[in-house]
Structure formats: C-alpha cells, structure tokens
Amino acid sequence: MQRSKVPEDFLSLAGACGQERTFPMQKFYRLSVNIVKILTLLLAVFLFIGSFLTTCYAENMETQQVLLRFDNPLWNLLELAGYGLLFACCLSLSGKAGTKFRRGLLVFTLGLILLLGGMLIVFGRTVPAADALSVYNAAAEWIFGNKDIIHPTASYLSYYPQQLGLMAFLELLLRLWNLTGLSAPAWHFIKLVYVCLLCVAVLFQYRSLRYLWPNDWEPVSCCYLILVCCNLPMILYSSFVYGEIPSFAMLSVGLFLLLKLLADCIPAHSVETTSPDDTRVVGTSHALSAVTVFTALGSILFLTLSVMLRKNSLILIIAVLLVLFFEALRPGRSGRARIGLMAMAVCLTITSVGVLPLVQKCYEKKAGNTLSSGVTAMSYFAMGMQESSRGCGWYNGFNIDTYDAAGMNSDAANAISRAAVNERIAYFREHPGYAVNFYLHKHLSQWADGTYASRQATLATYGGRSDFLKEVYEGSLASAYIEWGNAWQNVLYLGMLLFCIATVRKRRPGNGSANAAANDDFRFRNICLYTYTGLIAVLGGFLFHTIWEANSRYIFVYSLLLMPYCAAGIHDGLVRLAAWRSNRTLTRHSNS
C-alpha cells in the first residue's frame, strides 16, 4: 500500500501563508528590541558622562547636604585603566585555569561578602534609624501585643501603610530571634540574615548569566564577580535594616526563574526558515510541562515578595510585564506558550498589586482596627519639584506636612499637592534656565553618587563602632571611600555603555581574520528582549526618579541590576581590544 503524497504546491502555499502571519510579528518584535537598544544606549551615554565628569557626595553627616564637584578626567582614566588591567588579568587566569578558577572566584566572592558583612556587624554597630527604626519598632510592638500600631491616625503605619510588608518580614525574624532567648539586640541577627540574603542575591544573579549570554557566560561571570568584590556600598547596605537587601534577593531569584523559563522551559527556537528579505523566522511546538509551570509560579512568588518588601520594586515588575507581553508575541512560540506567558503576566499583575493590600487587611483584621490610606503619591511628586537643604528634589517634609494639614484626608492632600505642582511648573516656565539646572542637579545627586548614600543610611550607632569605621563615616577615610565608589561607578556605567554599543553595531560577518570574533557580534546583536529586563527596569527607574522624591539610596538597587550588563560590556570590550591589537600586529608583520 502506497502512501499518498501531499502536492508540493500545497506545501509551498501553506508555508507562504504561515510566513505572511509570522513575518509582521517578527518585525514588530525586532522593532521593540531595537527601540529598547536605542533608549538604553542613550541612557548609558547620559549616565557615563555625568559620572565621569562629576561626583556627588556628602561630607557633613549631620546636614547630609549633597555636594557637587567636577572630576579630573585624567585621574578617572587612570582608575579605569587600573580596573581594565584587573579584569584582563582575571580573564587571562580564567582562560588558563578554566572552570576551577571561575568556581574558586565564586567561592572567594561569597566568602568575602560573609567576612566583610560579618566584620561590619561586629565593628560597625549600625542600628536602625528614621523609617527603618519605625518599622522595626512596629514589628517589635506587635509581637509584644500592642495592637495600637494599627490605627487610622495615631500610628506611623497610618502615614506609610506600604511598610506593612517589610514589618511582616521583620516580625518573622524577630520571632525567630526571640526563640533563642539571647539578650543581644535583634537587629544584629537581622543584619546577619541580610548578609546571607546578599550572598543569595549574588549567587542567583551569577547563575542568571548562563541564560543572559549562553555562549560567553563563563568569562562574563568572572568579570561580574570582580565587580561584586569591589562593590563596597553593597557591603555597607548589608547592615541597613530596611527593604533594599531582602527585596533585591527576592528579585534576583525571581529574575533567575524568569530567564530560565524563557530560555529553557519555553524557548522560541528549533526550526529556522528565511524570508525573501533575509528575516530569520523560528518555530517550535513545546508543551507546557510541570517544570515549566512550577518555574513560572516560583518566579511570580519571588517577584511578588520583592514588592511586599519594597514597593518601589513595582518598577521592575512593570519591566517584567512588558517583556512577558512581547515574548508572548514573539514568533516561534507555540499557542500554549503564548497563552501561558499571558496568563503569567496577568497573575503577576494581580499578585504584585494585591500583596500589600492583602497584608494590610490581615493586620487590620487581627487588630480589629483600620489604617488610613497614607501619604499620597502626588505629594511625593510635588516634593520632587521643590528645593531642599540636602539637594534639589530631596526630602523636605512636604509630603507628611501636607498630609497632616489636610487632616489625613487623601483628596484634600492631593488637591494641595496638585496646587504645589502647578505652582512649580509655572515657575519653571518663567525661569527655564533654573529648571534645567534644578533637574540636572537632581539627576546628578542621585546617579553620580558612587556611595549611593550608604554612609548616611548606616550612620546611626549606639556606640562601640571601631575607630577605623569612624574614619570611613566621618573622618579622613571618608574621601577615600567616596573616591572608591566613584571609580567603581565609572566602571559600571562604562561597562553598560560598551554593552549597549555592542548591541547596536551592525553585524559584519567574520572573515577568518584575527578580529573575526570581534566582528561577529551575533552574541549581542541578536539577543532576545528578555535579556534587557534589567536595563528596561533601570530605564523606568531613571524616568520615575526624575519626577519622584530624590535620593541616591533609591538608585542603589539599579546599580546592582546593571552589574551583569557591565560585566558583559567589559568582556566584549576587552575581546575587541585584544582582536584589534592582534590584527595590528599581523598588519605590521605583513608590511615588513
């Protein structure tokens, strides 16, 4: 019995119909990737120029006024050259020793974090202060049975109900500490937990490199670990009993699972076809397995926890939602995969938006009382347009004063804030030069501070701080710490810039010459949109903090998100430099 043959004309017609549907979607996807490439390149140029030419810092720890100085470009170039030599030596050792060196460097990095973080706990003696102390005390009072912290007016949480997520986390840690029966302050235990969470964050960000750049992740990971080892503000923030470190740890795990989901569980590759205009189309029919479902649920869980611990993480959630939407439309994904990614986006939206109200309802039900809606977002926008003793757009008390003046009525507070916004807009229109200077200083005070206000955030102590750390905070070593942070930040932004440049370069096919590897930038030019998740979040954070209350502490998490891209850019830059030198040597020999 002979099998019936399908006419070739029918197959050609079916393929053409499929391509008609696929190619517009492919172009739409590539257009979105190209837009992200251009915007992130512009941001990288802006950030690097600002950081390379200027430095913002605070000398007086009482007033904490942000000062601005112009840097010596030659000195900055010397510092960059020193870092470049360090990275080159690291890559050389990695090339010789291979996997053993990379694994040893990972163990060394995690050990260094534990060592320095532990030493900071013992000798730094940092204690919670300001908002951190208020949240800590609220958690402690709740454990002692004081339900008055849940009150519509007479409570810190009635002004800032978004802190309930962090309070719930601190309550858990305090209850665990109370089980030990030790009399030492619990915040030392919390700082130890934060050091461990910082190791978790670094480990999962390190593991994410395999999915970001599968071809070059090993040398890139070495550059990444060197960046981590040199990041002193990150160590100082491990003693900051607030939401930055635990939230970033949750973000790192959630993003790792997201990248694993998109790269491994439901990849969009397998069969390739080519259109008349040389557009590459890929197709696959992967089913959604149990591993895929649990990976997606895990990513949703940890990303949601990051929002619970720090509400500003919603900026990264928005970036993730955008990536999920465009990845669902990406050609090559099966119908099940598209539906699954869209369903994941819907679930993540619901959980990230609803987690804090849910926590609030739980506490209100236990206390038998309610909280007010809290200080309004509009008042923060208004405050971000005003002068402050610390800097342009920094905290000046307008938000809480407005909320009090309005009798803790959100509508009245919003009306006052809108009037203040309109007043400042009118003033900016009348004085455009002042407006440019205001927002330039606001930008630099946040993004050109290589310490990320780490000394200010961890300054408070009840005594016992070592003489060495006293000098770092307020003495002769403060300027050295500021310079160290400035140099590290210059490297961070330069690496980001090199990565963004590599992604927008036109592809030139390798010709077998010494610089063929440098010319063939397929590694970066054809990367997927999900690779840019961190950069999209940084772009969103840049726009948000331009209009929100200013503080360089808010930029700290974005600097951590940039480290993988910086490492990739540094590796690519060194590869191109080595190829250029090799090609130049060959040219000299051929001419002679």
Residue ranges and their predicted role:
Residues 192-214, 253, 498:
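Transmembrane-helix motifs of polytopic, lipid-linked glycan transferases
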Residues 205-230, 532:
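Transmembrane-helix signature of polytopic, membrane-embedded enzymes
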